[in-house]
Structure formats: structure tokens, C-alpha cells
Amino acid sequence: MTTPQISVQLYSVYGPSEADLDGTLGKLASIGFKNVEAFDFVRRVDALKASFDAYGLSSPTAHAILIEAGTATPDGLLDTPPADEVFAAAKALGVGTVIDPYVPPARWGDLASVEHSAKVLNEAAAKAAEYGLRVGYHNHDHEFTSTINGTTAYEVFAGLLDPSVVLELDLYWATAGGQDAPALLRRLGDRVVAVHVKDGPMRPGITAAHLPDDQVPAGRGDVPLVESIKAGSNISYAVVEFDKYAGDIFEGIADSYTFLADTLKG
């Protein structure tokens, strides 16, 4: 097992970062983060880079739409600039892996659609390589609730990807999609280089189409986070994330950081 570095997905602090990007990144650094996972970064490369330099932060992974141009994500926030623009911005920020965060549920219902998504991501991987980068995919729940000939659409998709394409498994959404996350990680093996660490109660009806508002700091919900991290063979980054959080988001992130730091040093 690789010992992952701790990171945090900046979507978790979307509101504060829109109001004060530099101050938000400073707070994350004060919690102890050395890594963040940027999103919606193309429009603000210079501001991000200045704050990264000021606080000793890096963004080894980042999110950008690559497969489904014009996609409206559940939060409705991500723009879809051209791939060359995405990869140039990523390289300027020091990103190594650009991860597509979302392909809509309608694209997972049949083999032809899944094949198309894999083809587009493979093409993006070839383009990314021109910039010295690689690409990956981040899941929600619907990739698992759709099946093709008895296999989840997600695993069909993974099997169609070029070996250079990596996976970032969102442990919360995989669990919400009915998966045994540790077993899934063992099946996927070295393809999974990052995980999203988020937690909450698992109950019927949880879906990314209606983001739940009862997520909790890591280790306080029903997601098998520790077992999942131990099951991964090649996880380089454990990325804290909240889709929504009812409390103080910085306190929630700090609690999740402490949980991960304690887990990983054990």
C-alpha cells in the first residue's frame, strides 16, 4: 500500500473562495494542507498560483470537464473550455493529473454511450500527454447504479480506458451507488491513484442529482474510509471533500484532515 498524501477538493470551499480566494487558501494551509485539488481553475490561474506560492501549496490533481462539453454538473459551476486551454492552465499551475469530475447519468445507460465517453477521454489523454500531463475520471453514484450485461457501467468504462488514464474513486458516491468500496478498489488495482474522502449516513435515495445536506467529517459516517484506503494498492492522494456541509466548513475540513492524518500515520 502506498501512503497517500492528504489533499482537499476546492469545491468544498466554493463560497468562501469566491469571496476571498487568497484568504481561503491561507486557512487551508493553516489547517496543515500542503496539497489542494483545484477546480474551475482555467479562469483564475494567476490568482491560484500566487496563493499557492504564498502558502506553500501544490495542486497535483485538478478537476476539469473533458468528456461531455457543455455539461451542467450537479452544482452547475464548471465551465468547459477547450482541452488545450485546460491543459495549458494545468501545466502552469503545476498540476500533473487533470480529472474529469462528471458525466451525466444519461450517458451511462447503454454500451454505445459508455464507449463514446471512454473514447473521448482516451483522446484527451493523448492531448494531455503533449503537455506532459495525464487524465483521469472521478465518479458519482450513477455510474454504479447503471449496469451493462451484468457489469456496472463504471467497470465497463474502466475496462475501455487506455492504460495511461487513471481513476479517482469517490468513496462516498461509490458506496451510495451500492458498492463495497474496499472490494472495488481491490478489483481496480493500480488504476486508482486518488480517492475522495467524504462521509455521511448511508440511506436509501442518496444521489448526486439531489446533493445531500447531511455529510459529516471523515470517520463519523457510514463510509468504510479506513478499509478503503488500506485496500488501495496505488493511492497517492486522499482528497477531503464535502458536497454540502451544514456546519462551519473549515471546522469540518479540519476534522477530516485530523482523521486522515491519524489514519495514515497508523
Stretches found by the model and what they are:
Residues 130-222:
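Acidic/histidine-rich catalytic cores of soluble enzymes
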